[in-house]
Curated annotation (Swiss-Prot):
GO terms for molecular function: ATP binding; thiamine kinase activity. The keyword Thylakoid does not apply. GO terms for biological process: thiamine diphosphate biosynthetic process; thiamine metabolic process. The lineage of its organism: Bacteria, Pseudomonadati, Pseudomonadota, Gammaproteobacteria, Enterobacterales. Belongs to the thiamine kinase family. The gene is thiK. Gene3D superfamilies: 3.90.1200.10. Catalyzes the ATP-dependent phosphorylation of thiamine to thiamine phosphate. Is involved in thiamine salvage. This is Thiamine kinase.
Amino acid sequence: MRSNNNNPLTRDEILSRYFPQYRPAVATSQGLSGGSCIIAHDTHRVVLRRHHDPDAPPAHFLRHYRALSQLPASLAPRALFYTPGWMAVEYLHGVVNSALPDADELAALLYHLHQQPRFGWRIALSPLLAQYWSCCDPARRTPFWLRRLKQLQKNGEPRPLRLAPLHMDVHGDNIVLTSAGLRLIDWEYAGDGDIALELAAVWVEDERQHRQLADAYAARARIDARQLWRQIRLWHPWVIMLKAGWFEYRWRQTGEQQFIRLADETWRQLRMKG
């Protein structure tokens, strides 16, 4: 269901107009951010998501909805409703763990995603990194950051090994173990890109876990494991800069100290690696 109303509504207006029998449920952290909430009617729950990034154009939020609309139920929650500024999606009942699933399970989930038809829009990291630089706190801009940004822009993004639809925010809190298996939530960064970029961006604990995931994926996708790992390493500098820039961006938006701590730690990692 999609509304054609062009004026963003408040949450209460959304509820009264489109979900009159629903009420906000007890707060939960399942894939929620920036004013999103769970609404419930009897035992039925729906996730009501708000477009919470003031610097992102409305088209990005619509892409999120379109991605969910074309993904199968074996991967993601169903998209239920869209109006400018809001969407409603299926609530997935299950268990969310902070830790990633084991390598074989996660590789199977990602390979299943990468076998789907492409979304129709490419992920471009270079303009995104430039946006993070321009939108961050000016006091946080350093010569080191600028040098790294210009070096990546000069080199250009790696040539894709294999193009596919990507999730691009794979970590334990975005994976739900349902009665039917693993599902991914929080698809706001989804787009088409290199499968090795997806694997490079997974929030792993260490290189050992990363190699296990890469090897499991290579076996499933019938790709040479060494070739895949080399491609993942080519994307690694981009992913680290992406994370550092995103932490800076979110700190400027929210003022939450967790983001500045994460940004500082990521910059330290970058400096240690030269």
